[in-house]
Amino acid sequence: MKTVLTLIVAATLSLFSVAFAADTVVPQTTPTATAPAPAVHNASAKTMHHKKAQKPNTIKNTHKTAPEQKAQAAQKHHKAAHSHKAPTVAPAAK
């Protein structure tokens, strides 16, 4: 039983040492043999900045005429002025 356990431990340690050796050994290749990776994949997510798609100026700069603006503003102010009613006081009962 001890020999089986010893063989398993030895096999496990040898596999770990082989994997470690494979990670630490860098194969010597010429730099022209491999294509450089695109810069997009090398940059971290923090440095990436995506710009928003901009709308064309014709959509962005649609101006209302003055009477339409005044009418809309009057409606808003009318609603705001009448939405805050003063509390009504009930007469005290004697």
Curated annotation (Swiss-Prot):
Domain of life where this protein originates: Bacteria
Compositional bias annotation for Low complexity: 30-40
Signal peptide: 1-21
Broad class of the protein's primary localization: periplasm
Cellular component GO terms held in the UniProt record: periplasmic space
Region (Disordered): 30-94
Subcellular location: Periplasm
Residue spans of biased composition, Basic residues class: 75-85
Disulfide bonds listed in the record: none
Record keywords: Periplasm, Signal
Coiled coil: none
Function: Required for growth and/or survival at acidic conditions.
Family per similarity comment: Belongs to the Asr family.
Protein name per the record: Acid shock protein 1
Organism: Yersinia pestis
